[in-house]
Amino acid sequence: MRLYLIRHGETALNVKGCYYGRTDAVLSEKGISQARYLKEILKEVSFDYIVASPLVRAYNTAQIVMEEREQEIFGDRRLMEQDFGIFEGMTYKEIQNTYPKELDAWNEEFSTYRIPKGESFADVRSRAEDFLRDIP
């Protein structure tokens, strides 16, 4: 089996340097161009199964890459990015100023620290492993 992992194209929140996992940001013009470029790179690749995060930026990237193919794209919440909880939508500087203790804890225990109202990296890994076990 060959597995292709593709990241979504750029969004305005990427440009601003914001942490966002669950915020449903749309692709920027550059992000759309990136997806079209990827479509060209992958045009000769045959896919048995296409799965994307249901968030607009990821799903639209998959739609652009696959737009001339007759394959269904399945959305799967387990592929969503990390839920950054109280950090969601903020820049690193904003997080430093607003939540310094939580940021220190996250930096010290990145894999296990659960951001308040969000997830830990271990949570994300668990979701991804669960998804991988279910690949047909």
PLM ranges: what are they?
Residues L132-P136:
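Short, intrinsically disordered, charge-balanced linker/junction segments flanking boundaries
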Residues R7:
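Active-site beta-alpha turn of Rossmann-fold NAD(P)-dependent dehydrogenases/reductases
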Residues V15-C18, K101-Y113:
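Short, basic/glycine-rich phosphate-binding loops at helix/coil junctions
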Residues L13, F74, F84-K93, S111-A122:
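Hydrophobic transmembrane alpha-helix bundles
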Residues E10-T61, R114-E129:
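Loop-to-helix element that buttresses phosphate recognition and phosphoryl-transfer chemistry
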Residues M1-Y4:
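Extreme N-terminal starter segment of soluble prokaryotic enzymes
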Residues Y37-L103:
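Phosphate-coordination/substrate-recognition cap region in phosphate-metabolizing enzymes
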